[in-house]
């Protein structure tokens, strides 16, 4: 995980390398502040139920980012927190910025491969960091 910036009291963390649910689980487990989670991309047959409890405990907003968010929407529909769909990293970061509060962390930990919108996870991370810095 890579610290990106703190903007208006909100920390932004890049965990673009978390291309599976297990990696996202560890990232969420380490969060010590209320979290806005950005996730999504090319699903690899993920079992998202592995992170349900941590999302309920740690997150107050989910932001789905990708060309096809239908599996994420379907899975997390029963979790009673705001869920926002976006189709690019810039909109995902803007939505996170609008929904985060002072003291929160915005975490990009996608659970998915990056190939729907990016060349690879490094490209996704760079675009995330650039979008944060452009807020």
Give the ranges of each region predicted by the language model.
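Nucleotide phosphate-binding/pyrophosphate-handling subdomain across enzymes
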Residues: 1-59
């Amino acid at each position: 995980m890579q610290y990106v910036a703190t903007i208006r009291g909100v920390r932004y963390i890049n965990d673009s390398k978390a291309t599976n649910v297990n990696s996202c689980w560890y990232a969420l487990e380490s969060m010590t502040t209320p979290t806005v989670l950005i996730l999504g991309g090319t699903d690899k047959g993920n079992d998202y139920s592995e992170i349900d409890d941590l999302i309920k405990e740690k997150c107050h907003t989910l932001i789905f980012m990708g060309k096809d968010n239908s599996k994420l929407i379907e899975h997390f529909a029963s979790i009673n927190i705001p869920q926002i769909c976006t189709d690019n990293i810039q909109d995902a970061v803007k939505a996170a910025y609008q929904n985060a509060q002072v003291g929160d962390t915005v975490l990009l930990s996608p659970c998915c491969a990056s190939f729907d919108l990016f060349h690879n996870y490094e490209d996704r991370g760079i675009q995330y960091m650039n979008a944060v810095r452009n807020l």
